[in-house]
A protein has these predicted regions:
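Surface-exposed helix-capping loop/turn segments at secondary-structure junctions
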Residues: 78, 189-195, 228-232
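Conserved two-metal-ion catalytic palm core of "right-hand" nucleic acid polymerases
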Residues: 1-135, 143
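Conserved polymerase palm-domain catalytic core
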Residues: 23, 30, 99-200, 204-221, ...
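A short, aromatic/hydrophobic, helix- or strand-capping loop or linear motif
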Residues: 80-84, 151, 229-234
């Protein structure tokens, strides 16, 4: 059911779904006789939120990979994860990361007030610069020989060369959240960083001493260099806690009384206004229904409502209603 979610409209998926028993039986036979071969992926272009290359795989390959990921790979490799490794995991995700960040900010405020800085580390080209040997070495530590061989066969079929992955695959996402697991433990256990959070390749460290943050940044850079990464100097910064900072789509500010405010950044608001204009224009031309446009708008409101956005949602709602007049 999970594998066909979002792609049931495709003719190939419909055919597989109608003949599911025969198709699955055929897959099992090939796996048992050792004649299974991974299908070649088809390159696609992903346009939102930014243009990038991706891969599309056949449903039978998706089922096979999902079985490995859910039953062996993820359970084996996620046992060592720290709680503040927040991306792409059961019971975690972007909302969990935001809650953890607010907890870290509150705990820091209780001890140091507004005295402190926030270090934000962004890795340059995380997936495009991901070394294949580093990923395989990570998987090797947690998998038995047969599963490790199956995983390597999948990765080698989908990705040629020695560097770079596309982030669409579930297996590659598992690689993304696990490859920096050693860095997480190094920061927490060797550097004794108390307020540390990572969402995929976006790292947050909160500390009352700016010089200590500079030292931590140097140590993080050294660790990243060992596995072929470098930091994005344009996005990596140290910001005074009193000024606020942007993380995962929201601007975080701590008031003098310790209240933590979450507001959408201006780029998100500007983007939503333009998107609403396009949706209403398409609906008026009959290319989509008004219900579809309303659904997209409600989805944005639900996300905005996770922060302190009551007045903003009211303004954008009025703006959206005016577009229909």
């Amino acid at each position: 059911m999970k594998c066909k979610r979002g792609v049931l409209w495709k003719p190939a998926t419909k055919h597989f779904n109608l003949n599911a028993v025969e198709e699955v039986h055929r897959m099992v036979e090939k796996l048992e006789t050792g004649t299974w071969k991974n299908g070649q992926p088809r390159p696609i272009s992903i346009l939102y939120p930014k243009k990038r290359d991706g891969l599309s795989i056949m449903l039978k390959d998706r089922i096979y990979q999902r079985s490995i990921n859910d039953n062996v790979l993820y359970p084996s490799i996620s046992r060592s994860f720290i709680i503040d490794n927040c991306a792409c995991q059961k019971g975690k995700g972007i909302d969990f990361a935001r809650k953890r960040l607010k907890k870290h900010l509150w705990n820091h405020y209780c001890k140091h007030g507004l005295n402190g800085h926030v270090l934000q580390v962004d890795i340059k080209g995380y997936y495009p610069n991901m070394r294949h040997d580093a990923v395989k070495a990570k998987f090797r530590r947690y998998l038995n020989d047969s599963v490790y061989k199956a995983v390597c066969d999948i990765l080698d079929t989908q990705y040629v060369g020695e560097v770079g992955y596309n982030p669409g695959s579930q297996m590659v996402q598992i690689a993304g959240i696990s490859l920096l697991d050693d860095l997480d433990h190094y920061c927490k256990e060797r550097l004794h960083v108390k307020h540390y959070l990572r969402y995929m390749d976006d790292i947050i460290v909160i500390h009352d001493d700016r010089n200590e943050l500079l030292r931590i940044l140097t140590e993080i850079e050294k660790h990243l260099e060992k596995i072929g990464f470098s930091i994005n100097k344009e996005k990596t910064c140290i910001t005074p806690l009193s000024k606020g900072f942007t993380y995962l789509g929201f601007v975080y500010r701590v008031t003098s009384t310790g209240k933590i405010l979450m507001t959408l950044n201006s780029a998100n608001i500007k983007h939503e206004r333009k998107k609403l204009q396009r949706l209403v224009a398409l609906a008026k031309d009959g290319k989509i229904t008004k219900e579809k446009a309303d659904e997209c708008f409600k989805s944005w409101c639900a996300n905005a409502g996770k922060g302190n956005s009551y007045k903003l949602i009211k303004r954008i709602t009025d703006y959206y209603n005016d577009l229909w007049r």
